[in-house]
């Protein structure tokens, strides 16, 4: 299918493939999350989010496209402290406006400016400076302590139990020409498609727990063709609400857009936020 009009291209996404013998995957093996192990390549059709901008919402679908003009310059995003002191406040206000939340605390970010993540297999480390191409959800329930609760503190977390979410914001620093972001609606991805991958430190303590995703033809994928710096994607990653829905965690990934492999490398900023209701 031609990609010049960017309407509904068919692309290949990197899903999870279970071990053939039924044994659980070793999530400490970074090749499983970032490399070629346990890899299932599947063709999916992408839907342009812009025409459905007013219909696709965080509440019902788990993602939302909003307009956001930042006061940050392009160069400012090279300064981690300025991102924390200025851009975090902008993101917090944008999420408040979109959700009606009482309070938003931004707690970490990734600026991606290379073609792929850097892996150090021997040290079990990854630098998140390139697109994450595996279909995933950032946080599984067992990972919430490491992801947010440890940072926010026991006193705060006890006071907001059942009233908080993790929401990510994502926007490009330049118009996206390659390796865009794709997000699947939460209701189209049932729980049985999620595979928990939990990593541990050498001392046995939990490092992170996230979901990888099995292919399912029911998944409904969206993207924003040639996404501009003033177009911000918000998407849910976890909810502590006991009545949480499928829209409270959405699968997402970067992907290769056929014909755009030699375009300018994508530069983007993603901020993760604790959202309190």
Curated annotation (Swiss-Prot):
Q: Which reaction does it catalyse?
A: 2-[(1R,8S,14R,15R)-11-hydroxy-14,15-bis[(6E)-oct-6-en-1-yl]-3,5,9-trioxo-4,10-dioxatetracyclo[9.4.0.0(2,6).0(8,12)]pentadeca-2(6),12-dien-8-yl]acetate + 3 2-oxoglutarate + 3 O2 = phomoidride A + 3 succinate + 3 CO2 + H2O
Which keywords label this protein? Oxidoreductase
Q: Under which EC number(s) is this enzyme classified?
A: 1.-.-.-
State the practical use: Phomoidrides A and B (also known as CP-225,917 and CP-263,114) are potent inhibitors of Ras farnesyltransferase and squalene synthase. CP-225,917 and CP-263,114 inhibit Ras farnesyl transferase from rat brain with IC(50) values of 6 uM and 20 uoM, respectively. CP-225,917 inhibits squalene synthase with an IC(50) value of 43 uM and CP-263,114 with an IC(50) of 160 uM.
Give any GO molecular function from the UniProt entry. oxidoreductase activity
- Enzyme class, UniProt record, top EC level: oxidoreductase
Oxidoreductase: is it a keyword of this entry? yes
Q: Which InterPro entries match?
A: AsaB-like
This molecule's function is given as: Alpha-ketoglutarate-dependent dioxygenase; part of the gene cluster that mediates the biosynthesis of the antihypercholesterolemic agents phomoidrides which are dimeric anhydrides. Within the pathway, tstK is responsible for the iterative oxidation necessary to convert prephomoidride to phomoidride A. The pathway begins with the highly reducing polyketide synthase tstiA that catalyzes the formation of a C12-fatty acyl-ACP, starting from one acetate and 5 malonate units. The hydrolase tstM is involved in the release of the C12-fatty acyl chain from phiA.
Q: NCBIfam families, per this entry? A: CmcJ_NvfI_EfuI (NF041278)
Per the similarity annotation, which family is this?
Belongs to the asaB hydroxylase/desaturase family.
- Write down what this protein is called: Alpha-ketoglutarate-dependent dioxygenase tstK
Q: Which organism is it from?
A: Talaromyces stipitatus (strain ATCC 10500 / CBS 375.48 / QM 6759 / NRRL 1006) (Penicillium stipitatum)
């Amino acid at each position: 299918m031609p990609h010049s009009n960017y309407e509904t291209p068919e692309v290949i996404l990197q899903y999870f493939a279970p071990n053939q013998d039924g044994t659980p995957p070793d999530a400490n093996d970074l090749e499983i999350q970032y490399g070629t192990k346990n890899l299932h390549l599947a063709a999916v059709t992408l839907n342009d989010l812009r025409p459905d901008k007013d219909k696709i919402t965080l509440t019902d679908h788990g993602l939302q496209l909003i307009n956001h003009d930042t006061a940050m310059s392009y160069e400012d995003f090279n300064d981690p402290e300025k991102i924390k002191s200025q851009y975090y406040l902008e993101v917090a206000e944008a999420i408040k406006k979109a959700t009606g939340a009482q309070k938003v605390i931004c707690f970490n970010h990734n600026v991606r400016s290379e073609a792929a993540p850097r892996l150090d297999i021997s040290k079990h480390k990854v630098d998140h400076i390139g697109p994450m191409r595996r279909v995933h959800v950032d946080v599984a329930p067992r990972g919430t302590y490491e992801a947010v609760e440890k940072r926010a503190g026991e006193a705060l977390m006890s006071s907001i139990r059942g009233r908080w979410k993790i929401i990510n914001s994502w926007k490009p620093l330049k118009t996206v020409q390659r390796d865009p972001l794709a997000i699947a609606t939460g209701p189209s991805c049932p729980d049985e498609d999620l595979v928990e991958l939990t990593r541990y430190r050498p001392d046995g303590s939990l490092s992170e727990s996230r979901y990888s995703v099995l292919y399912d033809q029911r998944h409904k994928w969206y993207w924003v063709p040639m996404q501009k710096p003033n177009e911000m994607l918000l998407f849910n990653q976890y909810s502590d609400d006991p009545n949480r829905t499928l829209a409270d965690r959405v699968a997402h990934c970067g992907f290769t857009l056929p014909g755009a492999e030699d375009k300018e490398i994508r530069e983007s900023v993603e901020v993760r936020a604790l959202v309190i209701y």
